[in-house]
Design a protein with these regions (language model features):
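Metal-dependent amide/peptide-bond hydrolase catalytic core
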Residues: 1-5, 9-15, 36, 187-389
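Acidic/His- and Gly-rich active-site-bordering loop/insert found
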Residues: 2-107, 130, 135, 332, ...
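Short, solvent-exposed loop/turn elements at beta->coil junctions and helix N-caps
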Residues: 55-61, 172-174, 235-240, 330-331
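Acidic-glycine-rich active-site phosphate/pyrophosphate-binding loop
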Residues: 87-102, 178-189, 312, 343
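Short glycine/proline-enriched loop/turn "hinge" motifs that connect secondary-structure elements
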Residues: 90, 133, 177-182, 243-248, ...
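Glycine/serine-rich anion-binding loops at beta->alpha junctions
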Residues: 104-119, 345
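Acidic/histidine-rich catalytic neighborhood of metal-dependent amide-processing enzymes
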Residues: 114-185, 387
């Protein structure tokens, strides 16, 4: 390991990580109201003497309360961009969003998704800047807003900031995910025929048909060729009315997370096949669907030369290089459309994100900070990757 890199990694401060992570989690920052988190992170950078800029991301006309937080080390153009998102989903339960600690584990809304990753990026920046080592090649680190909703922070960032290699700090337990699932969000609509509730056979029940349609879709998704390539999640369903009648209307939202090998057309065929079967069984109910959002997945070659600095950083940080797939939708889908090689890699477990017991392990956040610091040193130093693909 190079002397400068070793010195920087040794300076990663566990106490500083813990303090900032707790403060960040305690700063409630749902999408479109992220200013508290931006203030916490910008204050940490300012205290450490790390220069930054704010990029406005207006939600409505005249809104000046939202902004991406951007740091650049070294000259332009950038050879590396690291990205975290400061927003969380909204609080949905009475337990509160605040941080609580149990030994090495920090619980709280956004702990894994992804304030742990943001804190690791901040700590890496502080360690590198305090070491006083000049960057020969440009490094960008951005903390964006809006990821949990529209991705408007990332959309604004890519207008002016780009690099051949982009690292997204979403929770992967530090597995380098060079492949990323696609995402399709679909609304299902069923319109039936109203009748008295005591004689349901005289009508067409929109709720019954909807349930049958959704179960058919789920059942088909668990059959070849889809197992392990497709995750189906019925997210919302509502319909009927308070009166003593057969339900005339029902709507549902259903999510499809699909491997890069599954196309939008494959999902469309799955929906239509289920539609045909259910329509035959429920002739008095009309079924239709609308695709609301499609974000294609991607898979990058593990031999791409642009991965060189990341591979070396894993070695420097003492971590195993075993690439995997990221199974969720994220801002990575947006960045990948620009031609950058996008890799998802951060502390935390995706399975606990958005849950009541969301948490992240402090030692993993510390490992992430070491990895990011090593990557900044590798990419910003003498050995720089070409733009070859």
């Amino acid at each position: 390991m190079k002397k400068d890199t070793a010195r920087i990694l040794d300076s990663i401060d566990r106490n500083r990580i813990t303090s900032l992570l707790i403060e960040a989690i305690n700063s409630y920052s749902p999408s479109f109201a992220e200013s508290q988190a931006v203030e916490v992170f910008s204050a940490a950078l300012e205290k450490a003497g790390v220069p930054y800029t704010l990029q406005p991301v207006p939600w409505t006309t005249g809104d000046d309360s939202r902004a991406n937080l951007i740091v650049q080390l070294g000259p332009s153009p950038l050879v590396l961009l690291l990205v975290g998102h400061v927003d969380t989903i909204g609080l949905w339960h009475e337990g509160g969003h605040g941080a609580r600690r149990n030994d090495d584990i920090i619980y709280g809304l956004g702990a894994a998704d992804m304030k742990g990753g943001c804190v690791a990026l901040i700590e890496a920046l502080i360690a590198v800047v305090k070491a006083g080592i000049p960057m020969k090649h440009g490094i960008g680190v951005a903390f964006v807003v809006g990821e949990e909703e529209s991705g408007d922070g990332a959309q604004e960032l890519i207008k002016t900031v780009s690099a051949p290699l982009t690292i997204i700090g979403e929770p992967t337990a530090l597995v380098p995910c060079t492949a990323h699932y696609g995402y399709l969000e679909t609304r299902l609509i069923s319109t039936g025929q109203r009748a008295h509730a005591a004689v349901p056979e005289a009508g067409g029940n929109a709720i019954n048909a909807m349930l049958a349609w959704m179960m058919k879709i789920i059942g088909q998704s668990q059959s070849p060729p889809f197992p392990s390539q497709l995750a189906v999640n019925p997210r919302e369903i509502h319909g009927g009315e308070p009166y003593f009648v057969v339900a005339e209307h029902c709507e549902a939202l259903i999510d499809f997370h699909v491997s890069p090998d599954v196309t939008r057309e494959d999902i469309e065929m799955l929906i239509r096949t289920a539609h045909k079967s259910v329509s035959t069984a429920h002739p008095l109910v009309h079924l239709e669907h609308q695709h609301l959002l499609w974000a294609p997945g991607f898979r990058h070659s593990e031999e791409d030369q642009r991965l060189g600095s990341l591979r070396r950083a894993y070695e420097q940080a003492g971590l195993s290089w075993q690439p995997g797939d990221f199974r969720s939708h994220s801002d990575a889908n947006i960045f990948n459309t620009t031609g950058t090689l996008t890799v998802v890699c951060g502390p935390g477990d995706l399975a606990v994100a958005h849950g009541r017991e969301e948490h992240v392990r402090l030692d993993e956040v510390e490992q992430a900070a070491r990895l990011y610091a090593a990557l900044i040193c590798e990419a910003g130093g003498d050995q720089v990757e070409s733009g070859s693909r």
